[in-house]
Amino acid sequence: MADPAYIVDGVLTDGEAWVGISTATPVSADVSFVSTDDGQVGDFSQYMDLVIISYCRSAAAGSWKDITLQFNNDTGSNYSAQDLYGNGTSVGAQATNPTSTGLAYISGSDSTANVFSAVIHNIFDINSGKWKSLTVQSAGESSNPDTAWMEAGIWRSQAAITEIDVKAGGTFAAGSMISLFGILPRMVA
């Protein structure tokens, strides 16, 4: 088996732990990232954590639309979340037990034209035998009003994460971009 691009003759050549795995430019409702299980860059088993950075907007009508994650095709109520949000006028919080996690809100088609939301999902300890935890930060502009959103979530499964489905409320608008990064264990001083 050949070494991934960031390893040369068995030595980690990149001093940083971040590895770009894949970038999608969706114009549909969902984006799936699936582990290649081949020892190469796309093989999730080599990473400690995963990070998804999204710059996106929904094509669906409304000021705000949701963006969520599901792991390993699990559509059951095996997720938990604590959310905090604010818009400069009011703040709120909620606890949920949904069929997905990583909730954030992105600008919908009723928002100011050409304004996209930023969303960062940090998914921790993806190959451990523990329940998987994650954090989400997002912010976006809307006509009803601008909002910042944070979530701490749990996937109640001990399985290693081998697939991540990024789901939008509606469809992603043209120009949206979703990038997946793997975080390697530190192997250099």
List the predicted regions and their residue ranges.
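Surface-exposed molecular-recognition determinants
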Residues: 2-189
